[in-house]
């Protein structure tokens, strides 16, 4: 019997059909004799919709109240997925981030995990239940709800896998793995069978949307091997790990695009002490 952590993004649970598709994936894993912890994001564009609702009320809402609001998105997802699992005969229970034991610092909207108390998750697994956990959220020392920032559900999944010493951590997305470029934008890309943590971090920092860079950093720190898969097409994905055996030693593994980066060229700058400081000090 293996312990498997499975994470599903918002597009994987955006509607009824997708939720039942995820439920079948999870149930098949559990029915094969495995313990399963599932981490789920908010449905579809729920987080963006909640941000828009806040903007209708306040032009400058406090970070604490935003966390109270945004955390509700994942709670909808975990309850619906747990219902779907129970509906198809797979015993499941949903837990919020704080019920699952996530404790964080006080940096609202971009909190860092300080510890994970795994007793509740472990006790539910012992009862042969699938545990469905709300990603992206936790509780700080003031007992306030906090969120981990964009992509926080990936980080939640890796943290659970590390704390429970899981045998596998599977990240399900709407693509079939990590490609040499974004397959939704570039033709004839190639899926990578394996990629190192460092290579994945570089791609993530340059704008690749497959994995959140904080989750990869955490996976590297605790040596949690990741498997990136599609929730829509059951084919082998990409393994992200510390060392990759690559006989030919590819010089370039992938290409990513970041539209938020601009290049400014300044011509005819006088070669005088302090000139660069004056220019770049203003830009900074």
Roles of regions detected by a PLM:
Residues 1-216:
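Nucleotide/pyrophosphate-binding catalytic subdomain
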Residues 34-38, 211-214, 225-231, 235, ...:
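Flexible, glycine/charged-enriched surface loops at secondary-structure junctions
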Residues 40-47, 228-247:
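Terminal amphipathic helices with adjacent charged low-complexity linkers/tails
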Residues 131, 146, 226, 238, ...:
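A broad, low-specificity signal marking well-ordered, structured residues that form hydrophobic/aromatic
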Residues 173, 228-230, 268:
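Active-site proximal loops enriched in glycine and acidic residues that flank catalytic Cys/His/Asp
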Residues 219:
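Acidic-aromatic/histidine active-site loop/patch
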Residues 237-284:
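A conserved regulatory-domain signal marking ACT and ACT-like small-molecule sensing domains
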């Amino acid at each position: 019997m293996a312990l498997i952590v499975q994470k599903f993004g918002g597009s994987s649970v955006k509607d009824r059909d997708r939720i039942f598709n995820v439920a079948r994936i999870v149930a098949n894993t559990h029915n094969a004799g495995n313990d399963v912890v599932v981490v789920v994001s908010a449905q579809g564009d729920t987080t963006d919709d909640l941000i828009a609702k806040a903007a209708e009320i306040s032009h400058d809402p406090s970070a604490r109240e935003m966390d109270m609001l945004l955390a509700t998105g994942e709670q909808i997802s975990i309850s619906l997925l747990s219902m779907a699992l129970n509906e198809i005969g797979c015993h499941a229970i949903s837990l919020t981030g704080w019920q699952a034991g996530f404790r964080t610092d006080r940096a609202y909207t971009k909190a860092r995990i300080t510890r994970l108390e795994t007793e509740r998750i472990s006790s539910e697994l012992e009862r042969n239940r699938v545990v469905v956990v709300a990603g992206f959220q936790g509780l700080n020392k003031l007992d306030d709800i906090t969120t981990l920032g964009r992509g926080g559900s990936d980080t939640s999944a890796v943290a659970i896998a590390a704390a429970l010493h899981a045998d596998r951590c599977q990240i399900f997305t709407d693509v079939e793995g990590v490609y040499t470029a974004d397959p939704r934008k570039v033709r004839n890309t190639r899926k990578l069978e394996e990629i190192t943590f460092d290579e994945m971090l570089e791609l993530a920092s340059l704008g690749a949307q497959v994995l959140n860079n904080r989750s990869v950093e955490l996976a590297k720190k605790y040596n949690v091997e990741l498997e990136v898969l599609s929730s829509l097409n059951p084919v082998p994905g990409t393994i992200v790990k510390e060392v990759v055996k690559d006989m030919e030693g590819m010089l370039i593994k992938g290409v990513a695009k970041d539209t938020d980066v601009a290049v400014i060229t300044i011509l005819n700058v006088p070669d005088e002490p302090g000139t660069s400081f004056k220019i770049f000090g203003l830009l900074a």
